[in-house]
């Protein structure tokens, strides 16, 4: 009996500590945000065109690339907002009525990258995430969906999009974050929200 109780405590403590894993390793937003701020004129232009907050765009640039326009991830995400040509890039092209997908050189162009990344945020906001009422919850939902897909997020609430949105609208921003930390299949999802807040606070 004592052994079983000890095992239960180990599992419980492990679960509690895992909720804080999103803060590890530590991330100082000051330098990435400073580098991302140099692209603010482009971010403001793109934000105005697509109805997206330039501060949100800048925060995503800080998180995704640290302001480096030429960085390419191991998974093939490119540039300031780390867009994948075959997924988010293709979605933006389709939305614009274009065929194909952006090239690597196009995605390394700061203005094109920010424009397409901002367009993708707008597509998410007015598409899969349409109907979320709370602005901060929408912001959190946007960055989680930007990083890991809207479908993965919505399925943590319901397989039915309408029901998922209704459940999201029952939550405060803090409750939404807690739900993501507990239920999202991607461990980096709550960390992204945490990084977003760090970046916004550093501006």
Swiss-Prot record:
Lipidation (N-palmitoyl cysteine) at which residues? 16
Chemical reaction(s) catalysed: Endolytic cleavage of the (1->4)-beta-glycosidic linkage between N-acetylmuramic acid (MurNAc) and N-acetylglucosamine (GlcNAc) residues in peptidoglycan with concomitant formation of a 1,6-anhydrobond in the MurNAc residue
> What is the topology of this protein in the membrane according to its UniProt annotation?
Lipid-anchor
- Identify the GO cellular component terms for this protein: cell outer membrane
Q: Where is the lipid attached (S-diacylglycerol cysteine)?
A: 16
Q: Where in the cell is it found?
A: Cell outer membrane
**Database matches in Pfam families:** SLT (PF01464)
Question: Which keywords does this Swiss-Prot/TrEMBL entry list?
Answer: Cell outer membrane, Cell wall biogenesis/degradation, Lipoprotein, Lyase, Membrane, Palmitate, Signal
Signal peptide range? 1-15
Q: Which GO terms describe its molecular function?
A: lytic endotransglycosylase activity
Primary localization? membrane
Query: In Gene Ontology terms, what is a biological process of this protein?
Result: peptidoglycan metabolic process
Q: Which InterPro entries match?
A: EmtA (IPR023946), Lysozyme-like_dom_sf (IPR023346), Transglyc_AS (IPR000189), Transglycosylase_SLT_dom_1 (IPR008258)
Q: What is its EC number?
A: 4.2.2.n2
Annotated PANTHER family: ENDO-TYPE MEMBRANE-BOUND LYTIC MUREIN TRANSGLYCOSYLASE A, SOLUBLE LYTIC MUREIN TRANSGLYCOSYLASE-RELATED
What is this protein's function? Murein-degrading enzyme. May play a role in recycling of muropeptides during cell elongation and/or cell division. Preferentially cleaves at a distance of more than two disaccharide units from the ends of the glycan chain.
Q: Which family does it belong to?
A: Belongs to the transglycosylase Slt family.
- Put simply, this protein is called Endo-type membrane-bound lytic murein transglycosylase A
> From what organism does this protein derive?
Citrobacter koseri (strain ATCC BAA-895 / CDC 4225-83 / SGSC4696)
- Higher taxonomy: Bacteria, Pseudomonadati, Pseudomonadota, Gammaproteobacteria, Enterobacterales
């Amino acid at each position: 009996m004592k052994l079983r109780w000890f095992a239960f405590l180990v599992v419980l403590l492990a679960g509690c500590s895992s909720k804080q894993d999103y803060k590890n390793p530590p991330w100082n937003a000051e330098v990435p945000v400073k580098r991302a701020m140099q692209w603010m004129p482009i971010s403001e232009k793109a934000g105005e065109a697509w109805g997206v907050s330039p501060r949100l765009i800048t925060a995503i640039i800080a998180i995704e690339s640290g302001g480096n326009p030429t960085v390419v991830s191991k998974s093939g995400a490119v540039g300031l907002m780390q867009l994948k040509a075959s997924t988010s890039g293709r979605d933006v092209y389709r939305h614009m009525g274009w065929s194909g997908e952006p090239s690597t050189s196009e995605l390394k162009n700061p203005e094109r990258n920010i424009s397409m990344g901002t367009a993708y945020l707008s597509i998410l906001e007015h598409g899969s995430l349409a109907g979320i009422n709370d602005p901060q919850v929408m912001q959190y939902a946007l960055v989680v969906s930007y990083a890991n897909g809207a479908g993965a997020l919505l399925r943590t609430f319901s397989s039915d999009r309408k029901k998922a949105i209704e459940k999201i609208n029952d939550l405060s921003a803090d409750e939404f974050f807690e739900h993501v930390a507990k239920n999202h299949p991607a461990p980096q999802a709550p960390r992204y929200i945490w990084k977003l807040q760090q970046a916004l606070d550093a501006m």
